[in-house]
Amino acid sequence: MSITKDQILEAVAAMSVMDVVELISAMEEKFGVSAAAAVAVAAGPAEVAEEKTEFDVVLKAIGANKVAVIKAVRSATGLGLKEAKDLVESAPAVMKEGVSKDDAESLKKSLEEAGAEVEVK
């Protein structure tokens, strides 16, 4: 008479925690395996990182050509002259929040061409 999987599961369910630990140790020794390796492999696929879809464009420093940076900020944000100047002078400052990757890269490129130091977060 052979033992079924259900009977084994019932027997393990009836065991105390210490008995289960001893059973696992005995199985590791008998079959030459490690229960920890199986757990690590099972946990691997759960760590899927989501790709970021919204980015913040941060003006880190204005560089040598302040006027060109102010013009680039005005054209990119639609701010008035005073608001754009205040934003540039308050660097490091967040210029735009929650923009797409393409928009963030485009904005970064135009500001860097004007001489600013820009970071996309």
From Swiss-Prot:
Superkingdom of origin organism: Bacteria
GO terms, molecular function: mRNA binding; structural constituent of ribosome
InterPro entries (alphabetical): Ribosomal_bL12, Ribosomal_bL12_C, Ribosomal_bL12_C/ClpS-like, Ribosomal_bL12_oligo, Ribosomal_bL12_oligo_N_sf
One GO process term, biological-process aspect: translation
Signal in keyword set: no
Tagged with keyword Ion transport: no
One Gene Ontology term, aspect cellular component: cytosolic large ribosomal subunit
Keyword vocabulary terms for this entry: Ribonucleoprotein, Ribosomal protein
One Pfam family here: Ribosomal_L12_N
Assembly with partners or alone: Homodimer. Part of the ribosomal stalk of the 50S ribosomal subunit. Forms a multimeric L10(L12)X complex, where L10 forms an elongated spine to which 2 to 4 L12 dimers bind in a sequential fashion. Binds GTP-bound translation factors.
Function in brief: Forms part of the ribosomal stalk which helps the ribosome interact with GTP-bound translation factors. Is thus essential for accurate translation.
Family of the protein in this entry: Belongs to the bacterial ribosomal protein bL12 family.
This protein's name: Large ribosomal subunit protein bL12
Native organism: Pectobacterium atrosepticum (strain SCRI 1043 / ATCC BAA-672) (Erwinia carotovora subsp. atroseptica)
